[in-house]
């Protein structure tokens, strides 16, 4: 379960009280625009995230961001480009308009994702599965975890969601090794942007307790259709 901003504030305040020079760096992926403030307003010195997640509004094809203390942001830019150049130069591959439009759309798409996550939680709980967060509970990101307890069900759910995708719905999901994971991973990702998790998608490591992580969704109607189809297949 992710930390909410109140918890981040308590952690950062404690760290800074012990060492004011310590830098608190927060991975903000999946958490942008979910709460009414961001970690940099709650004691974090710098945050970073991906633009194929919340802030990209489902239309930005690649990229990421850093925000926070100007000195730290400039250091990150120097690491990205070169020392002495920093943020003064760089490329955006012509995606400037898409990035700005994605940021404009992001509050609405995050809202749809949150509604969808709550619906996913409610449906799976009704089917008898453990879910985290619980339906209608406070959320600090757009991810919904479901404990399926079965590799068969992992495959069944991922394949069903893939079949309900707007693109690549004809593909079969197969377990694959993914960098950063100890076990093979199953993914449902029929998305317009490759790898996008702000669009409706799911992934699940093939190991006990066989949890599946569902996230994203630009339209609540799509999530409803995917869940209806899944219920028919499970029952």
Predicted features and spans:
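Conserved PLP-enzyme active-site core in the AAT-like
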Residues: 1-111, 115, 121-124, 128-132, ...
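Conserved C-terminal alpha-helix-loop-beta "cap" of PLP-dependent enzymes
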Residues: 125-136, 140-235
């Amino acid at each position: 379960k992710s930390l909410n901003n109140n918890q981040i504030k308590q952690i950062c305040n404690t760290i800074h009280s012990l060492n004011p020079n310590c830098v608190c760096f927060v991975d903000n992926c999946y958490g942008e625009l979910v709460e009414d403030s961001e970690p940099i307003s709650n004691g974090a010195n710098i945050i970073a995230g991906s633009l194929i997640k919340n802030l990209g509004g489902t239309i930005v094809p690649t990229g990421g961001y850093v925000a926070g203390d100007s000195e730290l942001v400039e250091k990150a830019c120097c690491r990205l480009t070169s020392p002495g150049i920093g943020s003064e130069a760089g490329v955006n591959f012509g995606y400037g308009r898409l990035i700005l439009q994605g940021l404009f759309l992001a509050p609405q798409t995050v809202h749809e994702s949150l509604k969808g996550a709550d619906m996913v939680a409610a449906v799976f709980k009704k089917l008898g599965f453990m879910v985290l967060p619980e339906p209608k509970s406070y959320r600090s990101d757009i991810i919904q975890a479901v404990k399926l307890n079965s590799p068969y069900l992992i495959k069944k759910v991922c394949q069903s969601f893939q079949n309900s995708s707007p693109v690549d719905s004809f593909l079969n999901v197969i377990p694959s090794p993914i960098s950063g994971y100890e076990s093979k991973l199953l993914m449902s990702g029929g998305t317009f942007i490759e790898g996008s998790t702000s669009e409706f998608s799911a992934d699940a490591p093939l190991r006990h307790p066989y949890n599946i992580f569902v996230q994203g969704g630009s339209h609540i109607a799509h999530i409803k259709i995917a869940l209806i189809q899944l219920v028919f297949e499970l029952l």
